[in-house]
Amino acid sequence: MFALQGETMDTQQTIVVALGGNALGKTPQQQLALIQNTAKSLVDMIEEGYRVVITHGNGPQVGALKVSTDYASQHGVGPEIPFAECGAMSQGYIGYHLQQAMTNELARRNIHKPVVSVVTQTLVDAADPAFQHPTKPVGAFYSEAEAKKRMEHSGDVYVEDSGRGWRWVVASPLPTYIVETDTIKSLVESGCVVVAAGGGGIPVVKTEAGYKGVAAVIDKDNTAALLAHDIKADRLVILTAVEKVAINFNKPNQQDLDVINVEQAKQYSDEGQFAPGSMLPKISACVNFVQQTPAGEALITSLECAKQGLLGKTGTRIVA
């Protein structure tokens, strides 16, 4: 067991921390530099005595991998790699960067805790309506003629994207189960810092033969909430670009929120206070976690303010 000095496994709280894309950058080089700072904030939480599970986005990374393999395939210098495999590859190299940076930062502080990354599969329902209405553009841009040719051969859906060309679109189904849940829970209980469910997890469906990867994008915050509930975490922490959630955002009457309950969060969501592409999915994930874990709470804040947020000094807390 790897509990911190003065802590027991019974007194330590488990938190699931969802990193926003701003913590990772858009290229491997930028990511490696940014993650050094990210690691410091994460180790601050460990130093406070928390057991930490880290999830992260992978939008720019998986997109870059898909574009690269598409290009290689188009020019006859490499295979076209399926999207689920691109997701697995992104989990691998993001996990490697996080694992290495955190191991180094823990060593600098003389904290002896192993860090491990888990390639994670997330089960989705093959009958999820999202598969009938794919909306998430991924991969390379194509001409209209090439896109239509690919649609005829594959049955995939391509759409025109902002005048820049045609792109493949995939579904964004809801996560129902994380295949490696028990493994992640065991690692946490043994004292490991765990990086898991990157990019919302690799989407899989259940078939007669077992699990099978599918082309889809799962919202990372939804998966983080599911993971937090299933491993019985005490808190879900979603890190983003702002210190606090606000209503009337960017208006003269903007109001930062310190603590809101589930009903208030739902009311503000219904009023359209939260942008669908940014804050709304984070609020929804927090509501889902707190509804299923009434004794737990969720926190939304920035990476820089995470430690103070956990101490109740800043950030927005969502409670039952």
Regions found by a protein language model. Name each.
Residues M1-T11:
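Short, Lys/Arg-enriched N-terminal segments with co-localized hydrophobic residues
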Residues D10-A320:
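C-terminal catalytic "cap/lid" subdomain
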